[in-house]
Amino acid sequence: ALRRSKETPSVLICAGTGCIAGGALKIYENLKNECESRGLPVYIGLKHDSDEEKSLHVKMSGCHGFCEMGPLVHIEPMGVMYIHVKPEDCHEILEKTVLGGEVIDRLVYHLDGTAYPKQEDIPFYKKQHRVVLENCGTSDAEDIEEIRHTSYTERVNVPNAAARIAFN
């Protein structure tokens, strides 16, 4: 599994069907090419067998649930969520946000004149308690050990009474 610190920047491109239909695969390719053309020490993809730390991680993630705003790009550790991203935005995202720490206002969610750069502050997500999608973009779906430790079954909380009935 990929070993990286909490400070290692991660660019997560939503790979849900809506985002893919909107061009997410081209966004992924453009970000990958931008990184490679700059010679950035970057890890591209989900599975990483080396212990070597990289300065940037670019990967496709599961659906973020905000399909009508896709394609979505989520940048960690900043927590920034970009909406309606186009392939031609990749250079600016890499330059300004990933390398420069600057938020690109035109790519963040706006509602009633208020900008919401962080996913956690977007009203759509604000009152959600994510259970199944809690690890979306952070867990590696190709790593069986990680799946074992972050599986859906761990997320299920069966009340004691129901468990007694089911197992008696």
Question: Where do the PLM segments sit?
Answer:
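Feature of Fe-S/electron-transfer and energy-metabolism proteins
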Residues: A1-N168
